Swiss-Prot record:
Substrate binds at L140, V141, S142, G143, G144, D174, G187, D191, N283. PROSITE patterns: GLYCOPROTEASE. The keyword Nucleotide-binding does not apply. This is tRNA N6-adenosine threonylcarbamoyltransferase. It holds the Pfam family TsaD. The keyword Iron applies. Binds 1 Fe(2+) ion per subunit.
Amino acid sequence: MADSRDEPLVLGIETSCDETGVGVVRGTTLLADAVASSVDEHARFGGVVPEVASRAHLEAMVPTIDRALKEAGVSARDLDGIAVTAGPGLAGALLVGVSAAKAYAYALGKPLYGVNHLASHICVDQLEHGALPEPTMALLVSGGHSSLLLSTDITSDVRPLGATIDDAAGEAFDKIARVLNLGFPGGPVIDRYAREGDPNAIAFPRGLTGPRDAAYDFSFSGLKTAVARWIEAKRAAGEEVPVRDVSASFQEAVVDVLTRKAVRACKDEGVDHLMIGGGVAANSRLRALAQERCEAAGIRLRVPRPKLCTDNGAMVAALGAEMVARNRAASDWDLSADSSLPVTEPHVPGQGHPHGHPHGHDHVHEVSKENLYS
């Protein structure tokens, strides 16, 4: 991907949901990954509350930026650019990050890059396994997204092949965890219980796997309903619900469909690399089954460490560094948060700034830099 001689130093800000993430990278090398999570504040509601998330971002933003810079051992004045998630995500949460990034970039006189949350989830793998092959097939699975994407250039060309038509995989994990009274978030706890259960104990349905169904689309609403009804029927009959077997059987139904469709997409498109990202990619069974099926199909699997699969600022910085290295246009100062930013737009370029510098270094910038970071 980027020229090895060109390793831009970039700070990335991520606030699309409930994690305030700030990362610093130099090219494809991770220097810092600071995260402040508000997940505990949402747990009692059984899901993410947008207003709570936005307020938490406001409180955590400056301390998390300072922590990332300190962890990286770099000065803000040395940055080559500042990247921020512009979308998709929760509108209010995104706005906090975008506003902070604009303020820092303006004060420091640095180019600003508004980038796509989903494209960032793909690009983060560069920090783990080196430059992304082109093309790369990506399976992104999280609480808000379940998508199959083909990337020939992570900074400019990401093509959606399929997506969920109803619920995302992570959303289904959260729902079933609630029905089983296991708490929130559901992914990690179901993964834990499933390890002691039988994945073949209960035959739960696999959505959109018929011969006439969309080859690369996903559907988890029917599975979610089927599992919930099975549990309710057990309780109504006064029987004990086998939590471990239910967890394992439900989880197997999800990862079976995800991996089957991802491998098929690789074969159909002639791509020999599969990258899996997003919060659900931290699931141990998804990783194991994907590895098994990829090996059988002659496909190389790339999955970042679990900490880089969940939302973080490092992934935003990684994509920002790629934008700088490839001389992509920086964003304008009127960059706005876009809760439905399509993945076909890996970043939000400004108008008329082909070299990525939307402003000059005027007196205001120079004075601001001295005041803030002298």
